[in-house]
Amino acid sequence: MKYARVIGTGSYLPEKILTNHDLERMVDTSDEWIRTRTGIAQRHIAADSEMASDLALNASREAIKAGGIDAREIELVIVATTTPDMIFPSTACILQDKLGIGDCAAFDVQAVCSGFIYALATADMFIRAGKCQTALVVGAEVYSRILDWSDRSTCVLFGDGAGAVLLTGDERPGVLSTHLHADGSQSKILSAPANICGGKVQGKPFVVMEGNTVFKFAVKVLEEVVHEALTENNLESSDIDWLIPHQANIRIIASTAKKLGIPMDKVVATVDKHGNTSAASIPLALDIAARDGRIKSGQHVLLEGVGGGFTWGAALIRW
């Protein structure tokens, strides 16, 4: 049986840092209020000249370098993003060109904050089916472009960044299973309800969110999908060495870990320094934990995320 194994990770954060104290001068909020409710202290903001593909390019180069391969060996590029460079072509196609990769499949996946899990699952299925040997999976966001910077309930939450993983087919277990779900009836609780018609933006092109509803729904479905992954692999929560959740806010992260019986010292949390980077948050956190030596060969790593749509999912990996 062929598995998809992670052979390299990479990440990139824009140079500009926006702290809670900076936000105090922009909207009616405080560092104490933001930290208490979200756990966020700062977030990175892309320069005006930086697009999602630029962030993705930097993260991808790091992953390719870590994987020790030539970029031209990549046969599949998937980018998870809510903030693409343009309407079309896909950010994945733009990234493919910037990497100098020749003819290979390239496309975007849009599942908001669950996007990386969806993209990883798709690449895993390609490799398991024998349709490709090496795949690049990226989560990249310039979420600052779709924020209403006068709305203190949302602008304090998000940041920009990118994370990437390089996968290759192997007989040794890597990605053990992936689990994807969606419930379109909950689409209105987290959205950016706008479209383009006749060259004009129709509706509100900024993030709107029913915070309490999102919190309750997220904790419920994340617990369920994690148990689904554990059951399929005949594991208990105590068998998980590292939980790497979507970095929405520390309350969702801590509540989910508590329900699962996973201590916080087994949870990789970067939300304090990155904020919520949507589809980029999981691969960003994964890269940091891989590079600082926390994740070791043979360990079980559980990724989980939830996002607008409403979408959610999990992936269980043997490192």
Swiss-Prot record:
Cited CDD domains: KAS_III
Top EC class for this record: transferase
GO function terms (MF aspect): 3-oxoacyl-[acyl-carrier-protein] synthase activity; beta-ketoacyl-acyl-carrier-protein synthase III activity
Reactions performed catalytically: malonyl-[ACP] + acetyl-CoA + H(+) = 3-oxobutanoyl-[ACP] + CO2 + CoA
Alphabetized Pfam families for the sequence: ACP_syn_III, ACP_syn_III_C
Catalytic residues of the enzyme: C113, H246, N276
This protein's UniProt keywords: Acyltransferase, Cytoplasm, Fatty acid biosynthesis, Fatty acid metabolism, Lipid biosynthesis, Lipid metabolism, Multifunctional enzyme, Transferase
EC number(s) stated in the UniProt entry for this protein: 2.3.1.180
Keyword match Lipid metabolism: yes
GO cellular component, one term: cytoplasm
Compartments where found: Cytoplasm
Domain notes: The last Arg residue of the ACP-binding site is essential for the weak association between ACP/AcpP and FabH.
Function, as annotated: Catalyzes the condensation reaction of fatty acid synthesis by the addition to an acyl acceptor of two carbons from malonyl-ACP. Catalyzes the first condensation reaction which initiates fatty acid synthesis and may therefore play a role in governing the total rate of fatty acid production. Possesses both acetoacetyl-ACP synthase and acetyl transacylase activities. Its substrate specificity determines the biosynthesis of branched-chain and/or straight-chain of fatty acids.
Assembly and binders: Homodimer.
Full protein name: Beta-ketoacyl-[acyl-carrier-protein] synthase III
Upper lineage: Bacteria, Pseudomonadati, Pseudomonadota, Betaproteobacteria, Nitrosomonadales
Originating gene: fabH
